[in-house]
Amino acid sequence: MKRKKILAAVLAAAVLTGICGVQIVTKRWNVNSCFAGAYPVRGVDVSHHQGEIDWKELSGQNLDFAFIKATEGSSHEDERFQENWRLAGETDLFIGAYHFFSFDSSGADQADWYIRTVGELSGKLCPAVDVEYYGGKAADPPPRKETITQLSLCLERLEEHYGRKPIIYTTYKVYRRYIEGNFEDYPLWIRNVYYPPQLDLAGKWQFWQYRDTAVLDGYKGEEKYIDLNVFSGTREELEEYRIDSSGEQEAQIPGTV
């Protein structure tokens, strides 16, 4: 029996390696796609870079959710947010609006700008805040203490308004410097296009951006690629991230792996 189990494991590994190898050679998928296949709840995130989107066509490609860029800093609105928000809302996708965090603006002002721009979120996914380096910030990272303070103000203001902790999207470098140990009770959406976060962030992530060079049908912008993501839980657990009409939400983080 033990030898049979070992043989089965070896064969499974060989099949997986073969599939991944074919995908690499044909450039249809990257290695991460093999591992992301273990999480069937799949989604995209988009901004004006994808240009005009045919949401009916896009949503029909085995997708469950979409995060749409709404705001950046304390005064910028994505030029395609209103159109994307309206049209995506006519599909069966779970949709959410994300904010691109600025290291150069007041966190409270950024939250207020998001609230004014996006409005009520009844039936939609809770807010997401994208925290990543931009410009020369990676080479010269913003002060840790001040960044944590401003990000806290932004997140707390959003939670106060919408009744639910926002999702934090981030990269590994930013996670290690600002997020880890400070915002552990917030849902984590981690970017890792190289390997599964299950290897070093097991039990800490809920969303995983596993690819940034995917090509789907249904959009025609300056950017030919689109980001692909998976949710760590089931579709029913994803539904727990929706804002209900009363604004009252469960305190726990569903779908944690």
Model regions and ranges:
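N-terminal Sec-pathway targeting helices
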Residues: 1-19, 23
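Hydrophobic single-pass membrane-insertion segments
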Residues: 21-31
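Substrate-binding cleft of extracellular glycoside hydrolase catalytic domains
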Residues: 31, 36-53, 68-153, 159-161
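Functionally critical loop-and-helix segments that line ligand-binding/catalytic clefts
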Residues: 38-51, 56, 183-257
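Sec/Tat-exported extracytoplasmic proteins
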Residues: 62, 70, 89-92, 118, ...
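Glycine-enriched alpha-helix->loop->beta-strand junction motifs that scaffold or abut catalytic
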Residues: 62-65, 92-93, 123, 182-189, ...
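Catalytic domains of cell-wall/extracellular-matrix polysaccharide-remodeling enzymes
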Residues: 126-201
